Amino acid sequence: MTQNLHPLLQRAQTNGIHFEMKGAVAVVRLSRPVKRNALSDGLVEALRDVFQNLPEEAKAAVIHGEGDHFCAGLDLSELKERDAGQGVYHSRSWHVALDAVQLGRVPVVAALHGAVVGGGLELASACHIRVADDSTFYALPEGTRGIFVGGGGSVRIPKLIGAARMTDMMLTGRVYNAADGERIGLAQYHVPTGTALNKALEDRKSTRLNSSHRRLSRMPSSA
């Protein structure tokens, strides 16, 4: 749906995002299934544009992934050597986008399935509620690849599971399945395979979240 949308929302749909309104819920779909919805620079920019320019009628948002995975993290085909200034700029672009998700004016629910890995876990951790179906698995492979967790996840993820568990994930490549992810705090809900999006879209949940979200949005940024 592009009619009557902000121009930046329309542009986002050319960069790997599909956007639509379902009642008062903004549904944001990561649409790079061939890449397992890996986060390219264009997709990160599109997430920023979407969450900075949601329609006024949006009272909640849901993020989900097209295909077999939520998000497999950084698009490694774009990985390249950067000098210090370029590295800071790239990291800040992720911070701005994920801050727009976490600190925007509506509560955001992530509907998780398949890979929630690296930058995908950073994105999920910026959401307020995470619903994971039974196919979900979590990992932080950055440490084994010599990549820094640079989008604010180094603060957000330890707040969910503790610094020791995050360190273990990064240093050993440990992978958590859906059940263990819920147990340690990576998700609040664990549902049968294929049902995460329906669970996330429940109107009662969106309404209940919205009533307290403005208090959450005034909290200091965790990024």
Predicted regions span which residues?
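Glycine- (often His-adjacent) and acidic-residue-rich active-site loop
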Residues: 57, 65-100, 116, 146
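Hydrophobic/aromatic residues within transmembrane alpha-helices
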Residues: 28, 63, 75, 123-125, ...
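Conserved small/polar residues in nucleotide/adenosyl-binding loops
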Residues: 207-213, 223
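Conserved CoA-thioester-binding segment of acyl-CoA-metabolizing enzymes
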Residues: 1-66, 85, 99, 203
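Crotonase-fold acyl-CoA enzyme core
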Residues: 8-11, 100-208
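Hydrophobic alpha-helical membrane-association signature
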Residues: 43-46, 90-93, 123, 196
